[in-house]
Amino acid sequence: IELVKFANPLDENSLLQITASDGYNFFISMDEVYENSELILSIQDVGGNKSFNIVGAESPKAWVRGVVELKVIATNILEIQGKSNHPFSFNPSEWVNEMDSTFVRLGDKSVKLQGVALRALWIYAEPEPNSTDIVISSESQVIKLNSKEFNDSDEIRLFTYLDEEGMEFILGRMNGEVLLRNVTSMEIK
């Protein structure tokens, strides 16, 4: 999308957030914005009503109709460490194709968020054979989950929430339940 390239985003770890008129949000990595020549913002004119659509994205989830906003956002990085053969820094821009969306309850409102299955992060980290738990922390709270609670399902996810104040990681379930807000670290035990 030449329009986004023209804005000259400074951070290579940024994401392009696409917002549709129905509230749907999806991310496209800036790598894809720069490298995918098939990615376009198309204009559709039906009966004098114009709408914009994103087409050509690598993920079919990013083919968004009724685009009302394109925003380049800086991403946060979350360290996933501990008893792991492959500790890594979770960067949402590298996991876009693994994300699914659902409405998550944040206080008195529901917000549609993208999230990666905790199981996928666990597998990618290659836990040591005797590892059974993951400790997930925020500045004020700690949750310990046994891998049996998430290894057979993609229900528990690490969601990415964006607002005027920046990016926040939220641990939650696909049914919208929030387990922990403002996640700051994950440690495999």
For each feature predicted by the language model, list its residue ranges.
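N-terminal intrinsically disordered, low-complexity segments enriched in P/E/S/T
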Residues: 1-189
